[in-house]
């Protein structure tokens, strides 16, 4: 008998009601779809939540189809956005997609997985087929989306390509003959549009199963790699542990339930809860030995108020002054120069214990040389 509780664990909605049970009763492997646009290089623990549901289906004999949206990324999902997304380059899409495949297989069963690029079918549609696709939905129906409605009422631009996005995602379901589609709660509209388009193409419509979205470590914004507010499943153990420990206390119940799939609630003491979460999270993705080492390193840094013994020594570039955002990005202490500037403006970059001011982007070489550098939770030494 199918274990429905395992399949729907932590699900927010399963639509239509009773449809998943009916499909399971057919006794054949279901085709379970999850689409991810490769807008960043790493899968974070929030994106792992629906991937875990896909693995639960695979463990019961069903087929998981992970669709990397290399074609839809050229449009960008407008869900939850107040303005049009910037279009990504083909080179960036291809690079990110390769990493998504690699990381997703840390969660999924390779033997029960199909890993696909939606350019396989979307790139072949002719204009006649696109017109057929657009006839499956009305503009008034599209404007029912909260994000489109809000932008329309405030005279914010909405491109026709954005209107096409939910239809492109829906056509993915047609192309692979999806029985179930997984997605975050912000994807409910797109998932239900997939049902409508499948019906228009003469297919049995998919079940829509939505999973919760979680906030990133700052506790304010949703977890997002593009915002730099995330914990990546491929983060190094020490970095993963540090990000977990820097998370706001209020996140722990959701993080335990959704990211660890823990049955018991977190400890009542906030610090103990975060330590246990950080250790268990690193253990989940890197193993017990790495978790123990990360915890020990954290204790050396923060309990003893000093950098770890193996803090890297960073060579200064030529020139004076040193442009700090470039220096941090070049040494992988920030994901980009823009992220480095944000860290500086937030007081998150310190030289010998003193935070750099928001306008201190260029620092004299003499001040940098030999200094202890702290960026967020990480330490380094600058060569003298």
Task: Briefly describe each language-model feature range.
Residues 11, 87-210, 217-219:
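Divalent-metal (Mg2+/Mn2+/Ca2+)-assisted nucleotide/phosphate chemistry catalytic cores
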């Amino acid at each position: 008998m199918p274990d429905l509780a395992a399949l729907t664990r932590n699900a927010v909605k399963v639509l239509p009601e009773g449809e998943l049970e009916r499909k399971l009763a057919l006794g054949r492997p279901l085709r379970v779809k999850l689409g991810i646009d490769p807008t960043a290089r790493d899968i974070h623990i929030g994106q792992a939540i629906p991937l875990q549901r896909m693995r639960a289906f695979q463990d019961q004999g069903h087929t998981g189809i992970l669709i990397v949206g290399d074609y839809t990324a050229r449009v960008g999902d407008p869900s939850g956005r107040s303005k049009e997304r910037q279009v990504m380059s083909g080179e960036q899409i291809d690079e990110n997609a390769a990493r998504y495949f690699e990381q997703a297989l840390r969660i999924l069963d390779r033997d029960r997985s199909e890993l696909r690029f939606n350019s396989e079918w979307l790139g072949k549609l002719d204009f006649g087929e696109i017109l057929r696709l657009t006839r499956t939905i009305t503009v008034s129906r599209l404007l029912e989306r909260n994000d489109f409605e809000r932008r329309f009422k405030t005279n914010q631009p909405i491109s026709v390509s954005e209107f096409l996005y939910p239809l492109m995602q829906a056509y993915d379901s047609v192309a692979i003959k999806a029985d179930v589609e997984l997605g975050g709660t912000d994807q409910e509209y797109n998932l239900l549009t997939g049902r409508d388009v499948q019906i228009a193409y003469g297919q049995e419509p998919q079940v829509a199963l939505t999973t919760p979205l979680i906030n990133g470590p700052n506790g304010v914004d949703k977890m997002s790699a593009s915002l730099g507010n995330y914990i990546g499943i491929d983060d190094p153990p020490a970095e993963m542990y540090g990000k977990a420990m820097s998370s706001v206390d209020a996140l722990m119940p959701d993080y335990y339930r959704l990211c660890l799939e823990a049955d018991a609630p977190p400890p009542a003491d906030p610090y103990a809860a975060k330590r246990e979460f950080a250790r268990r999270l690193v253990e989940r993705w890197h193993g017990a030995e790495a978790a123990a080492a990360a915890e020990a390193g954290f204790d050396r840094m923060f309990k003893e108020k000093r950098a770890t013994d193996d803090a890297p020594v960073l060579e200064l570039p030529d020139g004076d002054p040193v442009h700090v955002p470039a220096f941090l990005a070049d040494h992988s202490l920030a994901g980009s120069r823009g992220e480095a500037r944000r860290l500086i403006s937030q007081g998150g970059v310190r030289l010998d214990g003193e935070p750099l001011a928001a306008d201190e982007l260029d620092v004299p070489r003499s001040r940098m040389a030999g200094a202890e550098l702290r960026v967020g939770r990480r330490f380094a030494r600058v060569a003298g």
